[in-house]
Regions:
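ABC-family P-loop ATPase nucleotide-binding domains
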Residues: 78-146, 405-474
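ABC ATPase nucleotide-binding domain signature region
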Residues: 33, 46-111, 362-431, 509, ...
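Conserved beta-strand
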Residues: 8-11, 19-32, 63, 343-361, ...
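Coupling and communication elements adjacent to P-loop NTPase active sites across diverse families
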Residues: 2-11, 95-147, 230-349
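Pre-Walker A (P-loop) beta-loop-beta motif of ABC nucleotide-binding domains
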Residues: 24-42, 190-191, 356-371, 502
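GG-anchored amphipathic helix commonly corresponding to the ABC/SMC/Rad50 NBD signature/C-loop
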Residues: 146-166, 384-386, 456-478, 493
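H-loop (His-switch) and adjacent beta-strand-loop-beta switch element
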Residues: 205-222, 509, 515-527
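Walker B catalytic motif
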Residues: 167-170, 177, 449, 477-481, ...
Length: 527
């Protein structure tokens, strides 16, 4: 029999400016792999934070949460603050004790600490090796790539086999092989897991979908593809129902109009008969009174039917989620021709890849490929810091725009509008608000501190700001730009990249996203 890991009831989160969700009710079961899906800004990450740490001053929620098992949490941002791998795994004291025992410098406390723990070092090594991470527990975390840091943070959680896991976009920054590793580890984690994700591949392997929208949360027992099929069928049925109610309402209004027209015609005929004197006045008055009573009855019935049909139409329309289309394009003001970038035997001291060559013409788009930690982000960062001139390794003749993985161009404590103003002071707050509205960041959200936005909303704001930089940009350097975005917003960004007439170097581990960008050329970095 399936046992409940967590029971959630009447969960609501309301801010002065916005209600994120209200009266959510659902259960999470042990030994099951479940995912929470939904558009950016609905509060998915907030749900994970609340479930993990119920006393949160910045999230004034209401509701009841009851845990039956220990649980652990992976944040969407700030995943690691450790100095070494041992510290990141949470085993630093135990590891140090084993080290002192190995060199013959142990104390009584060291032997006491390691009692019944002798199997642990082998487990640590196995976990790190399977994740393709350095197995030296003294290795500095600062030297790891973002993808490697994500895997290390996940390893720390997978070591807690009795903990139910709450994971916020766990596949962000992971390369293809690392995503397969993640899927395998999630499937084999004994206690179960509940994660937020927009990763189609990862969502295909879940057993339970919790879909969050403006109406609440819906639990469906299936994977993502099956959910999409069921949801599409349901939405089409609701749309047909709403259209049918609309047709019936129109027909009732037409009938009401015809009834009124017939009544007016009869009244005109009665006036004509009265004037002609062909019928007695008493008889005409009697007929008029009867007709008036009959018309009043019919009109009352028709009005009642109209009100009922309006109510049915309103109810059917309210069941449909009203989603305004988003709009975003990359600005491109001039056309460059010829070669804009040439790289010859490039290699940096901190990268693992072999020296490589690269030539890029104006308008070219390429996919920069390679495993986690090989140096893709390092290369993009180096390019972004290279001035438009020749060096011994790089010739660059255009301005570049660089989007890093951590959205470091914006200040967490400043408001959204204040952050955007830093990119271009000539753009008015009204114009910024209009542009934000096209990305579904509306109303008072523009005045919130940047850190109060969801991960996807933060990325949208960053893209918008970068897009309004004053110098004309001819080369976009995009480091996993799809991270944090919901599936619909990923499609919007892919379309913007595809239609951008300048050049693009894209780092991404999402094959579906790369294909949607229309990028067919690639450069593979190898060790």
């Amino acid at each position: 029999m399936t046992q409940t890991a967590c029971t959630i009831s009447k969960l609501s989160l309301e801010f002065p400016l916005k209600t994120l969700f209200k009266n959510l009710k659902f259960n999470l079961n042990q030994q099951q792999l479940s995912a929470c899906i939904g558009r950016n800004g609905l509060g998915k990450s907030c749900i994970l934070k609340i479930l993990y740490e119920q006393n949160l001053k910045d999230l004034p929620y209401e509701g009841e949460i009851s845990w039956n098992v220990p649980h652990a949490y992976l944040s969407q941002f700030s995943r690691l603050e450790a100095d070494t791998i041992a510290s990141a795994l949470g085993v630093e004291d135990l590891y140090d004790a084993f080290q002192r025992i190995e060199i013959g410098n142990a104390s009584f406390e060291d032997f006491e600490l390691t009692e019944n723990q002798w199997h642990r070092p082998a487990l640590w090594q196995q976990q790190l090796k399977q994740a393709s991470l350095p197995t030296d527990l003294n290795f500095p975390v600062a030297q790891l790539s973002e993808g490697q840091k994500t895997k290390l943070a996940l390893c720390a959680l997978f070591l807690k086999t009795d903990h139910y896991l709450l994971l916020d976009e766990p596949s962000n920054h992971l390369d293809a092989s690392s995503r397969l590793w993640l899927i395998d580890r999630l499937k084999n984690h004994p206690a179960g897991a509940f994660f937020v994700s927009h990763d189609r591949e990862l969502l295909q392997h879940v057993e339970h979908i919790y879909a969050l929208n403006e109406f609440g949360v819906t639990h469906v027992t299936c994977n993502y593809e099956e959910y999409i099929q069921k949801n599409d069928l349901q939405n089409k049925a609701l749309q047909r129902n709403a259209m049918q109610h609309q047709r019936e309402l129109k027909q009732l209004k037409l009938q009401q109009h015809e009834t009124q027209m017939k009544a007016q015609k009869r009244e005109q005929q009665g006036h004509a008969l009265r004037k002609s004197g062909s019928q007695a006045k008493v008889l005409l008055d009697f007929k008029k009174e009867q007709a008036g009573q009959s018309l009043a009855t019919v009109q009352t019935q028709q009005q009642k039917q109209l009100e009922e049909k309006r109510t049915q139409l309103l109810q059917s329309q309210q069941q449909l989620e009203h989603i305004k289309e988003q709009q975003f394009v990359f600005q491109h003001r001039t056309e460059k021709t010829g070669e804009i970038l040439r790289v010859k035997d490039f290699h940096s001291k901190t990268s693992q890849h072999l020296p490589f060559d690269l030539a890029l013409q104006a308008g070219d788009k390429i996919h920069l490929k390679g495993k986690n930690g090989i140096g893709k982000s390092t290369f993009l960062k180096y390019l972004s810091q290279t001035t438009s001139q020749s060096s011994h390794e790089i010739f660059l003749s255009v301005n570049t725009l660089y989007l890093d993985q951590n959205l470091s161009d914006l200040s967490p404590e400043l408001s959204v509008l204040d952050n955007l103003a830093k990119f271009n002071r000539d753009v008015s707050s009204t114009e910024w608000r209009n542009q934000l509205g096209q990305l579904r960041i509306r109303g008072q959200k523009a005045e919130l501190p940047f850190h109060c936005l969801s991960g996807g909303e933060r990325l949208k704001v960053t893209l918008l700001g970068l897009n309004y930089l004053t110098p004309n940009i001819e080369l976009l350097l995009l480091d996993e730009p799809e991270n944090h975005l919901d599936i619909e917003s990923r499609a919007l960004l892919a379309q913007a990249i595809q239609h951008y007439t300048g050049a693009v170097i894209l780092v991404s581990h999402d094959a579906y996203f790369v294909e949607s960008c229309g990028i067919q050329s690639s450069v593979q970095l190898v060790e």
